[in-house]
Amino acid sequence: VEDSGGNMKPYKENKKGNLTERVFKENTDTHELVWHRDRLDREVTVLESDGWMFQMDNELPIVLKEGDVIEIPKNTYHRILRGNGNLKITIKE
């Protein structure tokens, strides 16, 4: 999926107001799931996950489960690790 700047993203997204829904497909290349940081604080809610994991900088990965809510402070490095099936999340900034 290409963003407005012409960069490829490993997800599809749909924005509704201050909420963004993202879907990462089960066949996402693991090389696309890179360490990154965001400019704003984010609250991520897991809608669908089967073995996908989330990792903050200097912490061990945690398995994402449906209903989990993760607070990610701005400028904090983090990444996701691929599991089975799709990962569906909502992001509130």
Specify the residue positions occupied by each region the protein language model found.
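Short, Lys/Arg-enriched N-terminal segments with co-localized hydrophobic residues
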Residues: 1-7
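Conserved short histidine dyad/triad with adjacent acidic residue
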Residues: 20-39
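Short, conserved beta-strand element in jelly-roll/cupin
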Residues: 38-53
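Ligand-binding loop in jelly-roll beta-barrel domains
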Residues: 73-93
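Short acidic-glycine-tyrosine-enriched beta hairpin
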Residues: 58-75
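Double-stranded beta-helix
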Residues: 8-24, 88-93
